[in-house]
């Protein structure tokens, strides 16, 4: 009987022990979870308090920065703006230092916009000054170029005037030499003509050549009481200064050719291209009028 009770009691005791162990483990687990939950709540409260403190510190820092910016804006306005603008910005700075939250941000934005407009005005002013300086430099360069061109033109005019004066002087000297060379021989002595007589004789010399069209140089010299060589020299001088135009052939004749006839001959040569002396001589009879003006007048 005792043995039976023993075998019955042992399993029951084992079951009770196992149950007690499980209950104790669950209790410890519940206690651990409870401790973790309490710890999490504590950490949450600490974080919330830290966030609140951080927010307060940030607000204080923003307020401090707003005060500094307001003071700086006031000092800058006092240096650059008019008294009215200084007063306005001072009032804005005072309001900014007292404003908080959304109202303070709005005032800060307004002040920043005003500063941005001022910076834009300064940039536009600097740009206008730069354009003005550039325009002044361009005008200065243009004035220098104009002055240089005027100097060059003046020098060129002076050179042309000097060359013209020299040419006129040279022509005058040649004319005087030619005029003084005409002399008449009377009783074996050469008497110098007056200026008017020399000029008249020169014009008569030229007109005689034009009227004859073709004249022997010996006859020309004899007609004016000159030596043949002197007549040739005077004729060459007249050809050089353009008083008459023509050619001296190899037979001692001078053929007077008008400028118009010269142009006709030149056109004939250009049309033919290559022209021989024979062809030119044959064509000259039709291109150049060789009939004396005296005969034509008659």
From Swiss-Prot:
It comes from Osmerus mordax (Rainbow smelt). It is found in: Endoplasmic reticulum membrane. Residues 110-149 have a biased composition (Basic and acidic residues). It holds the Pfam family DDRGK. GO terms for biological process: cartilage development; negative regulation of IRE1-mediated unfolded protein response; negative regulation of PERK-mediated unfolded protein response; positive regulation of plasma cell differentiation; positive regulation of reticulophagy; protein K69-linked ufmylation; protein localization to endoplasmic reticulum; protein ufmylation. Component of the UFM1 ribosome E3 ligase (UREL) complex, composed of ufl1, ddrgk1 and cdk5rap3. Residues 71-149 are annotated as: Disordered. This is DDRGK domain-containing protein 1. Gene3D superfamilies: Winged helix-like DNA-binding domain superfamily/Winged helix DNA-binding domain (1.10.10.10). GO terms for cellular component: endoplasmic reticulum; endoplasmic reticulum membrane.
């Amino acid at each position: 009987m005792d043995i039976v009770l023993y075998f019955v009691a042992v399993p029951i005791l084992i079951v009770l022990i196992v149950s007690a162990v499980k209950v104790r483990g669950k209790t410890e687990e519940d206690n651990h979870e409870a401790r973790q939950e309490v710890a999490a709540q504590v950490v949450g409260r600490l974080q919330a308090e830290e966030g609140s403190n951080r927010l307060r510190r940030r607000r204080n820092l923003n307020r401090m920065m707003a005060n500094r910016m307001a003071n700086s804006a006031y000092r800058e306005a006092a240096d650059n703006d008019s008294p009215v603008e200084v007063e306005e910005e001072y009032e804005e700075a005072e309001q900014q230092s007292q404003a908080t939250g959304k109202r303070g941000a709005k005032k800060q934005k307004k002040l920043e916009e005003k500063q941005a407009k001022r910076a834009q005005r300064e940039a536009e002013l600097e740009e206008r000054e730069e354009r003005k300086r550039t325009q002044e430099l361009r005008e200065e360069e243009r004035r220098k170029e104009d002055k240089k061109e005027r100097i060059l033109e003046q020098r060129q005019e002076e050179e042309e005037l000097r060359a013209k004066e020299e040419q006129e002087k040279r022509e005058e000297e040649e004319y005087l030499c030619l005029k003084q060379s005409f002399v008449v021989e009377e009783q074996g002595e050469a008497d110098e003509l007056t200026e008017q007589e020399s000029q008249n004789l020169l014009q008569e010399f030229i007109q005689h050549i034009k009227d004859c069209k073709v004249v022997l140089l010996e006859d020309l010299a004899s007609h004016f009481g000159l030596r043949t060589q002197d007549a040739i020299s005077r004729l060459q001088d007249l050809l050089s200064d353009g008083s008459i135009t023509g050619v001296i052939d190899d037979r001692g004749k001078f053929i007077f050719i008008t400028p118009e006839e010269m142009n006709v001959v030149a056109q004939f040569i250009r049309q033919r291209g290559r022209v021989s002396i024979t062809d030119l001589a044959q064509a000259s009879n039709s291109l150049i009028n060789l009939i004396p003006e005296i005969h034509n007048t008659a």
